[in-house]
Each structure stands twice: as structure tokens, then as C-alpha cells.
């Protein structure tokens, strides 16, 4: 009888040891990848995991993931298409292009447009500035609905040749009045696309 009990006890102990051994083997943590060896895909997965675990506020989400603000059409004057454009760009990043007159150097453009940016800042407009040529600059807005107000300010400046908003060119105070204006505007539009790509890349690297 005692022998039978002893055998059962040994059997139970053996099964217990076997279970613990198998469990420890299955739950052994995998070797973690050194964060210094992470590539872009690893970082993207890590960011997704963080976003799943955290309740991210709407304002902290990337722009393409945010819900567009509702447009109240009752407040829009149908006779002014610009008003609809303003509402549709509310809360979205938008680029405003401007040209400085008088064939300036890039340094002169930097100084002149820096003064413009300072005036906009003092008027509580949040804009970033990127000089993209000897006489060309981009003003990047976090809220695109203010683009037309900024355009109105820029075209009133003495050294402003023209301003481009959403592909539409507005002549500035120092606009050129010649037959080549249309051709120059088409060239600017092509150059603006390249400049916008460079500015976006610079923004992402900041």
C-alpha cells in the first residue's frame, strides 16, 4: 500500500516538473531587437503600437487622420467662392508662394521676407517661411483658412511682385506689367510644385 502511494506521489511530482519545464520553455521571452538596429518599418510598427495603446487627442493626430471640420454652409456667401475655399482649408496645412521684385539676391529675399514674416507673427499669424530661390519664398500655414488674409497683406508690400494661393496668382504692389506675365506664371507654377516638395521634406525632417 505504501509502495503504491509512493509511486503515485513520484508520478505527480514528475508530471509537475514536466509541466513547469514546458511552460518555462514556451514563455521564454524572445530576444529583443536593439533599438539602434531598427529600420523605418520597425519604427512605424512601434509608433502604431503606441497609438493603439494611447488615446491620442484629435489635435495630436497626423493631419491625414484627423476628421475634417464640418462646414456651415449657412455662413457662406454664395457670391464669394473665396469664402468656400477658406472654409474647406480650415485646420489644414497650406502653402502660400510669394515673389520679391527687383531681381534680389537670395540673401536680400531672406531679409525682406523675414520682415514680412515678423509682421505676420505680430498680427498673430502662425507661419513658417522657406526661401526656395533668389526671389521666391513659401509661407507655410498650419491653418489654411487664413491664406487669403495673408495674401492680402503680402500683395500690399512694396517689394511684393506676386502671391500664389492654390494655383491662383495675385499681382503684388510691384507686379511686372509685360506680355510675358502669363508665361512667367506658368513657369512659377511648375517651380512651385518642386519647391513645395522640398519644403514638405524639410518640415518632416524638423
UniProtKB/Swiss-Prot annotation:
Superkingdom per UniProt: Eukaryota
Record flagged with keyword Endoplasmic reticulum: yes
GO biological process, one term: protein folding
Region (Disordered), start-end ranges: 171-206
Residue ranges crossing the lipid bilayer per the database entry: none
Residues annotated as signal peptide: 1-24
Short sequence motif Prevents secretion from ER: positions: 203-206
Keyword Signal: yes
Locations listed in the record: Endoplasmic reticulum
Region (Structured core), start-end ranges: 93-166
Basic and acidic residues bias spans: 175-195
InterPro entries: MESD (IPR019330)
One Gene Ontology cellular component annotation held by this UniProt entry: endoplasmic reticulum
Entry keywords, A to Z: Chaperone, Endoplasmic reticulum, Signal, Wnt signaling pathway
Family named by the database record: Belongs to the MESD family.
Matches recorded under PANTHER family: LRP CHAPERONE MESD (PTHR17600:SF2), MESODERM DEVELOPMENT CANDIDATE 2 (PTHR17600)
Purpose: Chaperone specifically assisting the folding of beta-propeller/EGF modules within the family of low-density lipoprotein receptors (LDLRs). Acts as a modulator of the Wnt pathway, since some LDLRs are coreceptors for the canonical Wnt pathway.
Subunit composition and interactions: Monomer.
Name under which the protein is recorded: LRP chaperone MESD
Species in which this protein is naturally found: Danio rerio (Zebrafish)
Gene name as annotated: mesd
